[in-house]
């Protein structure tokens, strides 16, 4: 029996009128079913601890699904009930980076994932 992979595409978006605000994600990830993956989102051009960071999922041909958000100042999180056991949100304020770890990956997790301020 052959092995299979799950493709995760990463993207970022920032709100506001300031063109220098940037959220950077590294690109695509290829992982095996059952594995975990940690996605990163590096922020620049604004005070990282002043805005919540949201994570959103989009599968081909489907709408956006809000996964959850984290307050970089306090580390407090709020999750969509559907993703409570799937995703873990964390931040590293020293590098202005937000992370989302996805657990026990399946084909249903193959999607584009956005971080959004």
UniProtKB/Swiss-Prot annotation:
One GO MF term: antigen binding
Chain residue ranges for the region called Framework-1: 20-49
CDD domains: IgV_H (cd04981)
InterPro entries in the cross-refs: Ig-like_dom, Ig-like_dom_sf, Ig-like_fold, Ig_V-set, IgHV
Taxonomic superkingdom: Eukaryota
Pfam families linked: V-set
UniProt keyword Disulfide bond present: yes
UniProt protein name: Ig heavy chain V region 186-1
Species annotation: Mus musculus (Mouse)
Lineage: Eukaryota, Metazoa, Chordata, Craniata, Vertebrata
